[in-house]
Amino acid sequence: MKYLLDTNICVHFLRGKFEVDKTLKLKGLENCYISEITVLELRFGAENSVDKVKSHKAVDIFLKGIVIIPIYGSIKKYAEEKVRLNKLGKPQNDEFDLLIGVTAIENKLILVTENTKDFERLIGIEIENWIVRK
C-alpha cells in the first residue's frame, strides 16, 4: 500500500508524537509521499515557530527522506471536486485540504490524516488515521 501523508501527520512526526515514527517504519517510508502543499504548510509552520532555524532544519531533514508529489497532475480533479461540492452546497472550506485530497485520489494513494472529516466528502478517496489520542 502507498500513502500520502497529510500535514498534521508530518507535524506529529516532527514533534515525536503519537508514535508516528514507529508507524512510518512499519509501513515503510518508501511507501509514503507528501504533497508539495504539505511542504508549503510545513515551511510556514517552521517560519512561524519560536526557533525558526531549528524548525527549518527539522523540515529539511524530513524532506530529504520522502518523495514530494506536485499538484499539477491533480488540478483538473481539484476543479471537478470544487464545483461538485459547491453545487451540493457543501463547499470545501480549506483549499489546501482539497488539493491534498485530490492529489491522493489522482495518484491512487491512501490519505493518512487525523482530520478525516475534512476529506471524507471527496469522491474516490481512501483515508486512514494513524493517530490514537488517549
PLM region descriptions:
Residues 67-114:
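Active-site neighborhoods of divalent-metal-dependent phosphate/nucleic-acid chemistry enzymes
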